[in-house]
Protein backbone atom coordinates (compact mmCIF):
# COMPACT_ATOMS: atom_id res chain seq x y z
CA UNK A 1 0.00 0.00 0.00
CA UNK A 2 2.80 2.40 0.87
CA UNK A 3 4.47 1.84 -2.50
CA UNK A 4 1.17 2.48 -4.32
CA UNK A 5 0.78 5.73 -2.42
CA UNK A 6 4.34 6.68 -3.33
CA UNK A 7 3.70 6.22 -7.04
CA UNK A 8 0.49 8.20 -6.74
CA UNK A 9 2.35 11.07 -5.09
CA UNK A 10 4.96 11.05 -7.85
CA UNK A 11 2.18 11.41 -10.42
CA UNK A 12 0.61 14.20 -8.36
CA UNK A 13 3.88 16.13 -8.27
CA UNK A 14 4.28 15.69 -12.04
CA UNK A 15 0.90 17.39 -12.56
CA UNK A 16 1.65 20.07 -10.01
CA UNK A 17 4.94 21.23 -11.50
CA UNK A 18 3.33 21.81 -14.89
CA UNK A 19 0.53 23.96 -13.42
CA UNK A 20 1.07 27.67 -12.76
CA UNK A 21 0.12 28.84 -9.31
CA UNK A 22 0.50 32.05 -7.37
CA UNK A 23 0.43 30.24 -4.03
CA UNK A 24 3.84 30.28 -2.33
CA UNK A 25 3.75 26.53 -1.71
CA UNK A 26 7.10 24.76 -1.60
CA UNK A 27 7.35 22.03 -4.22
CA UNK A 28 8.44 18.67 -2.85
CA UNK A 29 11.75 17.25 -3.97
CA UNK A 30 12.00 13.86 -5.64
CA UNK A 31 13.43 12.48 -2.40
CA UNK A 32 10.31 13.54 -0.51
CA UNK A 33 8.06 12.11 -3.19
CA UNK A 34 9.62 8.67 -3.53
CA UNK A 35 9.84 8.12 0.21
CA UNK A 36 7.60 10.38 2.29
CA UNK A 37 8.93 8.90 5.54
CA UNK A 38 11.74 10.21 7.72
CA UNK A 39 15.00 9.19 6.03
CA UNK A 40 17.25 9.20 9.09
CA UNK A 41 18.97 6.02 7.87
CA UNK A 42 20.89 8.08 5.30
CA UNK A 43 24.10 9.35 6.92
CA UNK A 44 24.90 13.05 7.37
CA UNK A 45 28.27 12.50 5.70
CA UNK A 46 26.45 11.27 2.60
CA UNK A 47 24.22 14.37 2.59
CA UNK A 48 27.23 16.70 2.86
CA UNK A 49 29.04 14.86 0.08
CA UNK A 50 26.00 15.15 -2.17
CA UNK A 51 25.69 18.90 -1.46
CA UNK A 52 29.34 19.54 -2.35
CA UNK A 53 29.11 17.37 -5.46
CA UNK A 54 26.02 19.24 -6.67
CA UNK A 55 27.78 22.54 -6.02
CA UNK A 56 30.93 21.69 -7.99
CA UNK A 57 29.53 19.31 -10.59
CA UNK A 58 25.89 19.92 -11.58
CA UNK A 59 23.90 16.69 -11.45
CA UNK A 60 22.83 15.19 -14.77
CA UNK A 61 19.49 13.51 -15.23
CA UNK A 62 19.79 9.71 -15.54
CA UNK A 63 16.93 9.72 -18.05
CA UNK A 64 17.57 12.58 -20.50
CA UNK A 65 21.22 13.30 -19.68
CA UNK A 66 20.65 17.03 -19.28
CA UNK A 67 21.66 19.15 -16.28
CA UNK A 68 18.99 18.82 -13.59
CA UNK A 69 17.12 21.99 -12.71
CA UNK A 70 16.25 23.25 -10.18
CA UNK A 71 19.53 22.55 -8.41
CA UNK A 72 19.20 20.05 -5.58
CA UNK A 73 16.74 17.79 -7.38
CA UNK A 74 17.74 14.23 -8.21
CA UNK A 75 16.08 13.98 -11.61
CA UNK A 76 14.34 16.26 -14.10
CA UNK A 77 10.73 16.66 -12.91
CA UNK A 78 9.47 15.87 -16.40
CA UNK A 79 11.52 12.67 -16.60
CA UNK A 80 10.08 11.04 -13.47
CA UNK A 81 7.04 9.76 -15.35
CA UNK A 82 9.28 7.87 -17.79
CA UNK A 83 10.54 5.62 -14.99
CA UNK A 84 8.31 2.73 -13.93
CA UNK A 85 8.71 2.24 -10.18
CA UNK A 86 8.00 -1.24 -8.87
CA UNK A 87 4.72 -1.26 -6.98
CA UNK A 88 2.60 -3.78 -5.09
CA UNK A 89 1.70 -6.57 -5.40
CA UNK A 90 5.17 -8.08 -5.79
CA UNK A 91 6.64 -11.57 -5.63
CA UNK A 92 7.68 -12.34 -2.05
CA UNK A 93 10.91 -13.90 -3.29
CA UNK A 94 12.36 -11.75 -6.07
CA UNK A 95 10.23 -8.60 -5.80
CA UNK A 96 8.87 -8.62 -9.37
CA UNK A 97 5.46 -7.07 -9.91
CA UNK A 98 2.78 -9.75 -10.19
CA UNK A 99 -0.70 -9.52 -11.65
CA UNK A 100 -2.72 -10.61 -8.61
CA UNK A 101 -2.45 -9.90 -4.89
CA UNK A 102 -3.80 -13.40 -4.27
CA UNK A 103 -0.56 -14.92 -5.56
CA UNK A 104 2.61 -14.94 -3.46
CA UNK A 105 5.22 -15.68 -6.12
CA UNK A 106 5.89 -14.83 -9.75
CA UNK A 107 5.97 -17.56 -12.39
CA UNK A 108 9.78 -17.74 -12.40
CA UNK A 109 10.03 -18.21 -8.63
CA UNK A 110 7.22 -20.77 -8.72
CA UNK A 111 9.05 -22.85 -11.32
CA UNK A 112 12.62 -22.47 -10.04
CA UNK A 113 14.04 -22.97 -6.57
CA UNK A 114 15.80 -19.88 -5.22
CA UNK A 115 18.84 -20.11 -2.97
CA UNK A 116 18.68 -16.46 -1.87
CA UNK A 117 16.26 -15.44 0.89
CA UNK A 118 14.60 -12.61 -1.04
CA UNK A 119 15.34 -9.38 -2.84
CA UNK A 120 13.90 -6.10 -4.08
CA UNK A 121 14.42 -3.70 -6.99
CA UNK A 122 13.59 -0.07 -7.64
CA UNK A 123 12.40 0.01 -11.25
CA UNK A 124 10.68 -2.15 -13.81
CA UNK A 125 13.03 -2.77 -16.71
CA UNK A 126 11.28 -0.69 -19.37
CA UNK A 127 12.86 1.01 -22.40
CA UNK A 128 13.81 4.11 -20.40
CA UNK A 129 15.56 2.03 -17.74
CA UNK A 130 17.32 -0.05 -20.40
CA UNK A 131 18.77 3.08 -22.02
CA UNK A 132 19.90 4.48 -18.67
CA UNK A 133 21.61 1.20 -17.70
CA UNK A 134 23.29 1.01 -21.12
CA UNK A 135 24.51 4.61 -20.76
CA UNK A 136 26.12 3.68 -17.45
CA UNK A 137 27.89 0.59 -18.77
CA UNK A 138 28.78 1.54 -22.33
CA UNK A 139 28.93 5.36 -22.27
CA UNK A 140 30.68 5.74 -18.91
CA UNK A 141 27.76 7.56 -17.25
CA UNK A 142 28.81 6.38 -13.80
CA UNK A 143 27.38 9.50 -12.17
CA UNK A 144 23.88 8.13 -12.78
CA UNK A 145 24.56 5.55 -10.09
CA UNK A 146 24.50 8.34 -7.49
CA UNK A 147 20.85 8.94 -8.31
CA UNK A 148 19.91 5.26 -8.28
CA UNK A 149 21.68 4.64 -4.98
CA UNK A 150 19.93 7.63 -3.44
CA UNK A 151 16.54 6.47 -4.71
CA UNK A 152 17.10 2.87 -3.52
CA UNK A 153 18.10 4.08 -0.05
CA UNK A 154 15.12 6.39 0.19
CA UNK A 155 12.74 3.60 -0.74
CA UNK A 156 14.36 0.52 0.76
CA UNK A 157 16.91 1.90 3.23
CA UNK A 158 14.98 0.91 6.34
CA UNK A 159 14.34 -2.57 4.95
CA UNK A 160 18.02 -3.07 4.15
CA UNK A 161 19.05 -1.90 7.61
CA UNK A 162 16.59 -4.28 9.28
CA UNK A 163 18.26 -7.23 7.56
CA UNK A 164 21.30 -6.77 9.79
CA UNK A 165 23.64 -7.58 6.92
CA UNK A 166 27.37 -7.80 7.55
CA UNK A 167 28.27 -6.70 4.03
CA UNK A 168 27.12 -5.50 0.64
CA UNK A 169 28.59 -7.77 -2.03
CA UNK A 170 28.53 -6.48 -5.62
CA UNK A 171 28.03 -9.02 -8.39
CA UNK A 172 31.50 -9.24 -10.00
CA UNK A 173 32.36 -8.97 -13.68
CA UNK A 174 35.15 -10.96 -15.28
CA UNK A 175 38.57 -9.24 -15.00
CA UNK A 176 38.85 -8.94 -18.79
CA UNK A 177 35.50 -7.20 -19.00
CA UNK A 178 36.43 -4.89 -16.15
CA UNK A 179 39.66 -3.93 -17.92
CA UNK A 180 37.75 -3.25 -21.11
CA UNK A 181 35.06 -1.14 -19.40
CA UNK A 182 37.25 0.35 -16.71
CA UNK A 183 34.84 -0.30 -13.85
CA UNK A 184 32.16 -2.60 -12.44
CA UNK A 185 28.86 -0.73 -12.22
CA UNK A 186 27.55 -3.05 -9.48
CA UNK A 187 30.56 -2.26 -7.30
CA UNK A 188 30.11 1.51 -7.70
CA UNK A 189 26.39 1.14 -6.95
CA UNK A 190 27.21 -0.89 -3.82
CA UNK A 191 29.75 1.73 -2.71
CA UNK A 192 27.15 4.48 -3.01
CA UNK A 193 24.61 2.49 -0.99
CA UNK A 194 27.23 1.63 1.62
CA UNK A 195 28.16 5.30 2.02
CA UNK A 196 24.55 6.24 2.65
CA UNK A 197 23.58 3.40 4.98
CA UNK A 198 26.89 2.73 6.71
CA UNK A 199 27.05 -0.92 5.57
CA UNK A 200 30.52 -2.30 4.67
CA UNK A 201 31.11 -3.12 1.00
CA UNK A 202 33.14 -6.30 0.42
CA UNK A 203 33.75 -6.97 -3.30
CA UNK A 204 36.47 -9.49 -2.39
CA UNK A 205 33.85 -11.89 -0.98
CA UNK A 206 32.80 -12.98 -4.48
CA UNK A 207 34.94 -13.47 -7.59
CA UNK A 208 34.10 -14.25 -11.19
CA UNK A 209 36.40 -16.99 -12.40
CA UNK A 210 34.87 -17.79 -15.77
CA UNK A 211 34.00 -15.50 -18.66
CA UNK A 212 30.52 -16.36 -19.90
CA UNK A 213 28.52 -15.74 -23.06
CA UNK A 214 26.10 -12.77 -22.98
CA UNK A 215 23.02 -13.76 -20.98
CA UNK A 216 20.45 -11.77 -22.96
CA UNK A 217 20.48 -14.24 -25.86
CA UNK A 218 19.78 -17.30 -23.67
CA UNK A 219 16.63 -18.79 -22.14
CA UNK A 220 16.41 -19.25 -18.32
CA UNK A 221 17.72 -22.83 -18.35
CA UNK A 222 20.61 -21.92 -20.65
CA UNK A 223 21.42 -18.89 -18.50
CA UNK A 224 21.83 -20.95 -15.34
CA UNK A 225 23.94 -23.56 -17.17
CA UNK A 226 26.03 -20.75 -18.66
CA UNK A 227 26.79 -19.48 -15.15
CA UNK A 228 27.65 -22.82 -13.55
CA UNK A 229 30.94 -22.43 -11.66
CA UNK A 230 31.29 -18.88 -13.01
CA UNK A 231 31.36 -17.48 -9.47
CA UNK A 232 33.30 -18.51 -6.38
CA UNK A 233 33.52 -17.20 -2.84
CA UNK A 234 36.64 -15.17 -2.22
CA UNK A 235 38.10 -13.76 0.98
CA UNK A 236 35.87 -12.96 3.89
CA UNK A 237 32.83 -15.28 4.07
CA UNK A 238 32.43 -16.85 7.48
CA UNK A 239 29.78 -19.04 9.05
CA UNK A 240 26.77 -16.99 10.07
CA UNK A 241 27.50 -14.08 7.73
CA UNK A 242 24.54 -12.24 6.21
CA UNK A 243 25.13 -10.49 2.91
CA UNK A 244 23.19 -8.37 0.44
CA UNK A 245 24.10 -8.98 -3.20
CA UNK A 246 24.05 -5.81 -5.29
CA UNK A 247 23.52 -5.62 -9.06
CA UNK A 248 22.11 -3.28 -11.67
CA UNK A 249 19.65 -5.61 -13.41
CA UNK A 250 17.68 -8.70 -12.36
CA UNK A 251 15.84 -10.50 -15.18
CA UNK A 252 15.42 -14.26 -14.81
CA UNK A 253 17.43 -14.46 -11.59
CA UNK A 254 20.10 -16.80 -12.99
CA UNK A 255 23.03 -14.54 -12.08
CA UNK A 256 21.75 -13.87 -8.58
CA UNK A 257 21.09 -17.58 -8.08
CA UNK A 258 24.62 -18.54 -9.15
CA UNK A 259 26.12 -15.92 -6.82
CA UNK A 260 23.95 -17.01 -3.90
CA UNK A 261 24.93 -20.66 -4.34
CA UNK A 262 28.63 -19.79 -4.33
CA UNK A 263 28.30 -17.78 -1.11
CA UNK A 264 26.15 -20.38 0.64
CA UNK A 265 28.65 -23.13 -0.21
CA UNK A 266 31.29 -21.02 1.55
CA UNK A 267 29.24 -20.87 4.74
CA UNK A 268 27.29 -17.63 4.37
CA UNK A 269 24.06 -17.95 6.34
CA UNK A 270 21.67 -15.58 4.54
CA UNK A 271 21.76 -14.01 1.08
CA UNK A 272 19.50 -11.12 0.06
CA UNK A 273 19.74 -8.84 -2.96
CA UNK A 274 18.99 -5.32 -4.12
CA UNK A 275 18.92 -4.23 -7.77
CA UNK A 276 18.15 -1.10 -9.72
CA UNK A 277 15.94 -2.77 -12.35
CA UNK A 278 13.92 -5.95 -12.54
CA UNK A 279 12.06 -7.73 -15.32
CA UNK A 280 8.29 -7.98 -15.36
CA UNK A 281 6.69 -10.83 -13.44
CA UNK A 282 3.61 -12.84 -14.35
Q: Model segments located where?
A:
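Glycine-rich phosphate/pyrophosphate-handling loop used in enzymes and phosphotransfer proteins
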Residues: 2-282
